[in-house]
Amino acid sequence: MILRLFSYQRLFLAKGLFFSFLFLFIASFALADEFDDLFSDVETKEASPEKKSLWRDLLNNSNFKFTLRSMTQYENPSPRKGLDDKSQFVDGRLNYDTKLKRGMNLLSLAMWFEYGNQKDTYKGIGDFPEDRDDHRRIVEFNEFNWVGSWDNFDLTIGKKVFKMGISTLYSPSDRISPKDFNDPLNPKELGTWLSQIDVFKGDTTFTFAVIPFFTPLKRPPTNSRWSGTGESSNSIESLIPNNLPSSTSVEEFPDRTLENIQALLRVKTTVKGWDFFLAAFHGPNFFPVLAANSPINFRTEQVRVGNYSIGFSTTYKKFEFHGEALYQLAYASKDDNYLNYVFGSTLTMDKRVKRIGLEQIDLTAEFSKEKITAKQTHSDFVVSSEESRAARDIILTRIIFKYSENLRMAAGFNFDFDERGHFETAGFEYKMAPGLIFKMHTEFINGKKDTHYGQFRENDRLVTALEYSF
């Protein structure tokens, strides 16, 4: 009882700190306006700029987007206890973002309200400072940060989505911001709390960031159609050997200690039309591994690793070329050491296609491969993160047909050479009026049971969406 009371106190304290942080930021901008008024009569009267209103600027910089989505499943799933076996799912989301600029200070906020009829999927507001619950949040403060800008550097403090990679369809380096995989074919990028400094020198940017809290990936609930054979993808249960008569498991996350702080360093530059980046990361692994407490007792851990990545992009005539590679070094051999790389290109056709009534065609293709250089060998760990790493030997393609500013069609195809699984999608979007877009696409997934694509093979569906931006 005492422990429970203590945990509640910590929760209230954390949420109190968050809202205090919000209040102080807004109050500081408001007070800045008042101090301007205080010294107004000692300033030169030659210039009398219009007084800035904090609330008017927030409103003028506000953007809203409401999305209503419908998902119709083509087939019934295999029956199991508690399964959410509906064939029609609906959800709605209202996105809101705004910015406030005062001198060298920039305050940014991005959030959304979301709900749907998926069973056991939505719940409350995200936990502070890290959200370790798999539920999608009804209210999600995804980004809330302050940026201070000086002549040759920026300082960022707060919550934001951090993009690392450079590739178009798949980036092995994008492992900083957590992701919501409640719907694996429609994932969401989530913000993470960090302190970041960007130093600018000519065409080169040096970035150093510290991320004090670890937030894991969000996975589908066990009663979801997207949990495959009955357990969440990337969960402990999916990693436990099938030949055990019975077992128990616990899920462990990194403690809030200095040892588990995440840190990254990145250098981005442009040289004669070539964009490059080089990065190093230290912290808990993006993917979990399985450790054994006893022959029938298991736990997952996000073990500490070093990730070292490099990437490039350039253009030549109608072609864009890009590539990146990540090498993971698992400390104490608690996971695999491996190299994951991707190379790809986008071809843009905008002249000859006008003969067939099109404005433009964009064709993108990428190939991703993984090479394990050292297997997991630590005696306490029994399963590596290999099965959680989806892009080990895969080709990804996408083609976009632009008929006009109002109508676009697209198709995509992925094929996994390692597991012989595949994914196809095709659809269109039509701009019905300024700010109003109708979208429709279909998705087909297939592969052997217990493979990345195969676990979703009963989830072919038709997705329609109506988006209104204002």
Language model region names:
Residues 103-107, 152-155, 203-206, 273-276, ...:
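Repeated loop/turn-to-beta-strand initiation elements of outer-membrane beta-barrel proteins
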Residues 30-103, 205:
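N-terminal periplasmic/intermembrane-space "pro-region" immediately following the signal or transit peptide
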Residues 94-102, 147-150, 159, 198-201, ...:
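Residue-level signature of outer-membrane beta-barrel architecture
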Residues 84-92, 137-142, 149, 188-193, ...:
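Residues that define the transmembrane beta-barrel architecture of outer-membrane proteins
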Residues 430, 435-437, 441-444, 456-470:
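Outer-membrane beta-barrel "beta-signal"
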Residues 281-283, 316-414:
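Detector for outer-membrane/organellar transmembrane beta-barrel domains
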Residues 66-74, 109-115, 157-159, 208-212, ...:
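Transmembrane beta-barrel strands of outer-membrane/channel proteins
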